[in-house]
Amino acid sequence: MNILQQLEQEQVAKLTAGKTIPAFSPGDTVRVNVKVVEGTRERVQAYEGVVIARKNAGLNSSFTVRKISYGEGVERVFPLYSPRIDSVELVRKGDVRRAKLYYLRGRTGKSARIAERTTGHGITKKDTGSEG
């Protein structure tokens, strides 16, 4: 491993020390809590939407979240290891077959829906106890 990769890994470890980032992929619905500075005050604002892209590039990793706000599509790109991101919560897993969901930009209503994934990678089954 060269020295640049080692430095980058140390930076990622330092930035993720206080928070846990769940494993999410395109198609998943996430709630990103972002620290917003307004004058002298700082507050946390929630941004919930569908992940339409994920760029895995070490320290420069980012993800794009799309939501519909007052009938208008809004996309926001978040750096994964940004100190402005307070937390990321996984709301639901989506069942998609693409890595980039840019085609959702041209769709509205029912055609823009994503089916929920209930089994497979990243899904943990809850034990309901013994039946019978």
Curated annotation (Swiss-Prot):
Protein's job: This protein is located at the 30S-50S ribosomal subunit interface and may play a role in the structure and function of the aminoacyl-tRNA binding site.
Pfam family, one: Ribosomal_L19
Family the entry assigns: Belongs to the bacterial ribosomal protein bL19 family.
Keywords of the record: Ribonucleoprotein, Ribosomal protein
UniProt keyword Ribosomal protein, yes or no: yes
SUPFAM superfamilies to which the protein is assigned, alphabetical: Translation proteins SH3-like domain (SSF50104)
InterPro entries, alphabetized: Ribosomal_bL19, Ribosomal_bL19_CS, Ribosomal_bL19_sf, Translation_prot_SH3-like_sf
NCBIfam families linked: rplS_bact
GO MF entry, a single one: structural constituent of ribosome
Cleavable signal peptide: none
Biological process terms in GO annotation: translation
Protein name: Large ribosomal subunit protein bL19
A Gene Ontology cellular-component term: cytosolic large ribosomal subunit
Keyword Secreted tagged: no
HAMAP family given in the database record: Ribosomal_bL19
